[in-house]
């Protein structure tokens, strides 16, 4: 028992630290249950498993239908937006090649607020500290600011827009969109359980 108290004191040196942790853990238990994903027989199925993880086994699309009224968002196609969330690098490269420069920039302007709203919706079941850990170090502060301002308080709309415009000036918008998509992919599945064969004998086994 003395060893137990010694270890406890190392992690929580003050009484206040223990109380804070107890409150935090109790509060976490009251949050909505995160999505758990069980998967097995991964051998030789890298591409299929990669697709399932990127799409959350279909959960991302289902959540998007809950998050938005797509009949009112006439400027954005649901399937097109889903592809951006699943394969951001490839989708951006495709759009950049097939759209004019002005049309491409307009599309990026439309995507970022939607991505931020999706991220805010997906992260609502987690604590702020857990969400913060998933954010890229490069864009962590910016994403937190955008999440805080996405409701577009009229008095702060220019603040939100200025952040995005500066990202365009610094040629960082594409990187931000990629990070947002990858973060959404991570947050859609809270726990991943591999319950069967994990040895991949396929061509992509190193991944």
Identify the residue ranges that each predicted region occupies.
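Feature recognizes metal-dependent phosphohydrolase scaffolds
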Residues: 1-207
């Amino acid at each position: 028992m003395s060893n137990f108290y010694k270890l406890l004191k190392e992690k929580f040196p003050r009484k206040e630290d223990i109380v804070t942790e107890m409150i935090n853990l109790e509060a976490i238990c009251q949050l909505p249950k995160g999505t758990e994903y069980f998967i097995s027989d991964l051998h030789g199925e890298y591409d299929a498993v990669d697709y399932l993880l990127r799409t959350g086994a279909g959960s991302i699309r289902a959540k998007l239908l809950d998050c938005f009224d797509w009949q009112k968002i006439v400027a954005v196609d649901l399937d097109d937006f889903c592809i951006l969330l699943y394969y951001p690098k490839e989708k951006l490269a495709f759009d950049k090649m097939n759209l004019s420069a002005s049309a491409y920039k307009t599309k990026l302007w439309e995507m970022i607020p939607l991505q931020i709203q999706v991220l805010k919706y997906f992260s609502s079941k987690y604590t702020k500290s857990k969400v913060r850990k998933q954010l890229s170090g490069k864009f962590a502060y910016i994403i937190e600011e955008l999440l805080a301002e996405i409701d577009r308080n009229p008095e702060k709309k220019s603040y939100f827009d200025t952040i995005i415009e500066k990202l365009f000036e610094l040629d960082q918008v594409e990187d931000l969109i990629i990070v947002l998509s990858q973060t959404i992919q991570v947050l859609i599945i809270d726990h991943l359980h591999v319950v069967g064969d994990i040895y991949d004998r396929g061509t992509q086994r190193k991944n």
